[in-house]
Curated annotation (Swiss-Prot):
Hydrolyzes ribosome-free peptidyl-tRNAs (with 1 or more amino acids incorporated), which drop off the ribosome during protein synthesis, or as a result of ribosome stalling. The lineage of its organism: Bacteria, Pseudomonadati, Pseudomonadota, Alphaproteobacteria, Rhodospirillales. It catalyses: an N-acyl-L-alpha-aminoacyl-tRNA + H2O = an N-acyl-L-amino acid + a tRNA + H(+). NCBIfam families: pth (TIGR00447). Keywords: Cytoplasm, Hydrolase, RNA-binding, tRNA-binding. Pfam families: Pept_tRNA_hydro. It is found in: Cytoplasm. GO terms for cellular component: cytoplasm. This is Peptidyl-tRNA hydrolase. Gene3D superfamilies: Peptidyl-tRNA hydrolase.
Length: 234
């Protein structure tokens, strides 16, 4: 059994925030694999289903991001899921929009949701780091992650969430590298078509050959000479 945690903040005011891409990914998974309905438990929302032949519990903590570890720890302990079998889906500033990285363990990288989980369960869980890009200035980070995705972001957001769901059985089976590679392949922009070389132009027809008049004068003079020869013969 796996515990798959999507991180975000509860409530409609935060629903489309960049910080809530983990919630969005969990929602797509639950719909794609026809999980049971969301229900309130473990200070969060929980849904159950099967992915790749494995029982999966999806969890969206409702504690607000900074206290996510309370909900994750409560679920993991009640369900007796070891930390090794927890997968956390979260937003990642240091990964480009539309890209992702997968890793096990490591630091929280300034992410308060991960810090909270670390404080309750340690760091040895898997993280799917869903790229949202960086605003370029640390002072802008808080406003950036709590701002809604733009309409234009749907061009990469929808494909990457679909690709994560489509490829999730590979992650369930433990093939983290294969999962990341496959998602990258599914979300890669199409290669531009190479322009075909222009067809070689057919050679221009040779100019018509015009016979030059006999040497020694004009055409009229040539005719006059010929007539003179005829008269002499007579």
């Amino acid at each position: 059994m796996l515990l798959v945690v999507g991180l975000g903040n509860p409530g409609s005011d935060y629903a489309r925030n960049r910080h809530n891409i983990g919630f969005m990914a969990a929602d797509v998974l639950v719909r794609r694999y026809s999980f049971g309905p969301w229900r309130s438990k473990f200070q969060g929302e929980v849904a159950e289903g099967i992915i790749g032949g494995e029982k999966v519990i999806a969890l969206k903590p409702q504690t607000y991001m900074n206290l996510s570890g309370q909900s994750v720890a409560a679920a993991a302990r009640f369900l007796k899921v070891p930390v090794d079998d927890i997968i956390v889906l979260h937003d990642e500033l240091d990964v480009a929009p539309g890209r992702l990285k997968v890793k096990r363990g490591g630091g929280a990288g300034g992410h308060n949701g991960l810090k909270s989980i670390d404080s309750h369960l340690g760091q040895n869980y898997r993280r799917v780091r869903l790229g949202i890009g960086h605003p370029g200035d640390r002072d802008l980070v808080s406003g950036y992650v709590l701002h809604d995705f733009a309409k234009a972001d749907e061009a990469w957001l929808v494909p990457v969430l679909d690709a994560v769901a489509d490829t999730f059985p590979m992650l369930v089976s433990g093939d983290d590298a294969g999962f990341a590679t496959r998602v990258a392949h599914l979300t890669a922009p199409p290669k531009p078509k190479k322009d075909r070389p222009a067809a070689e132009a057919a050679p221009a027809p040779a100019p018509a050959q015009v016979s030059a008049p006999p040497s020694g004068g004009s055409l009229a003079e040539a005719l006059k000479a010929a007539m003179t020869k005829i008269i002499r013969k007579d």
